[in-house]
From Swiss-Prot:
GO molecular function (one): translation initiation factor activity
Gene responsible for this protein: eIF3-S5
Gene Ontology cellular component annotations, sorted alphabetically: eukaryotic 43S preinitiation complex; eukaryotic 48S preinitiation complex; eukaryotic translation initiation factor 3 complex, eIF3m
Keyword Transcription among record annotations: no
Superkingdom assignment: Eukaryota
CDD domains named among the record's database cross-references: MPN_eIF3f (cd08064)
Function field: Component of the eukaryotic translation initiation factor 3 (eIF-3) complex, which is involved in protein synthesis of a specialized repertoire of mRNAs and, together with other initiation factors, stimulates binding of mRNA and methionyl-tRNAi to the 40S ribosome. The eIF-3 complex specifically targets and initiates translation of a subset of mRNAs involved in cell proliferation.
Protein name: Eukaryotic translation initiation factor 3 subunit F
MPN domain location: 7-137
Matching SMART domains: JAB_MPN (SM00232)
Coiled-coil annotated residue ranges, if any: none
Localization per record: Cytoplasm
Subunit details: Component of the eukaryotic translation initiation factor 3 (eIF-3) complex.
Species this protein is from: Bombyx mori (Silk moth)
Length: 289
């Protein structure tokens, strides 16, 4: 097992693990499941997961493998390009039963990873860790294994980032009774993104002005800002304004056409219901007296 492996986990995986933990049986202290994703060139990207019902005893582990295989087949039908990449468990540590469970997943995929999510919030945060199993032992002697930590990071697709930003707006001290937050229209999201970008640019300018005035600066941050400045197109102010206005007009046109198509489909559905013939069934049998 190579230790130069890295794991990337999508937010939907964490949400599913927490949901499975909240729905666990009253006598279950730990929840496990299968990780679904891709593995390429030492990078394991986890995009989905599902829970596997199980019971842990002092000397053995009982798992509903038939259920796991059924869910596996359903996932293969939906996305054949992804496969099993490992397994997950709730908690902040590796238990004695982890080696037994990992042995099963070693037969399902090559070099499975083990991800733990601390749903007990030890230390005030939900710790995310990833492990690989390294075999230990001497030749012709007793064999064993050891779980070694590997790098794990969160990664997001662009639609997931939008969803996380909407979820971030619900974080308020209102608790469970707080009202939901709508995603908003496309134009509202563009305005919000522009406002956020303006705030970030102001922070970057303040940092650059402070560094120029002699304040302590970070070399890595300076290189990132320089790369950002070089990546921006060298356009005149009027040319940039015209290009930006043209992009906004295109966006407004797309939003308008989408609303027109939506209205037309709704109207067509109502007209279809009004003009469709009524299906009647004629009973020709002898009535009961």
């Amino acid at each position: 097992m190579a230790l130069n492996i890295s794991v990337k986990v999508h937010p939907v995986v964490l949400f599913q693990i927490v949901d499975a933990y909240e729905r666990r049986n009253a006598d279950s202290h730990r929840v496990i499941g299968t990780l679904w994703g891709t593995s390429d060139k030492g990078v394991v990207e986890v995009t989905n997961c599902f829970c596997v019902p199980h019971k842990e005893h002092a000397d053995q582990v009982e798992a509903e493998l038939n259920y796991a295989m059924d869910v596996y087949e359903l996932n293969r039908r939906v996305n054949s390009s992804e496969s099993i990449v490992g397994w997950w468990a709730t908690g902040n540590e590796v238990t004695n039963h982890s080696s037994v469970i990992h042995e099963y997943y070693s037969r399902e995929c090559r070099e499975p990873v083990h991800v733990t999510l601390d749903t007990s919030l030890a230390g005030g945060r939900m710790g995310l860790r990833a492990y690989v199993c390294v075999p230990l032992g001497v030749p012709n002697g007793k064999q064993g294994c050891m779980f070694t930590p590997v790098d794990v990071t969160l990664t997001c697709y662009e639609p997931e980032i939008v969803g996380l930003q909407v979820c971030q707006k619900t974080v308020s001290g209102g608790g469970r009774g707080s009202s939901g937050v709508a995603a908003g229209s496309d134009l509202a999201q563009v305005m919000s993104a522009a406002s956020s970008l303006e705030s970030l640019l102001e922070q970057a300018l303040q940092y650059a002005d402070g560094a120029a005035a002699g304040a302590p600066a970070d070399a890595e941050a300076g290189r990132a800002l320089l790369q950002l400045a070089h990546s921006a197109p060298d356009l005149a102010k009027d040319t940039f304004s015209d290009a930006f206005a043209s992009s906004v007009k295109d966006l407004l046109m797309v939003v308008t056409l989408a609303q027109l198509i939506k209205t037309q489909l709704q109207l067509n559905e109502k007209l279809t219901l009004l003009t469709s013939p009524v299906n009647t069934t004629i009973y020709k049998g002898r009535p009961n007296v």
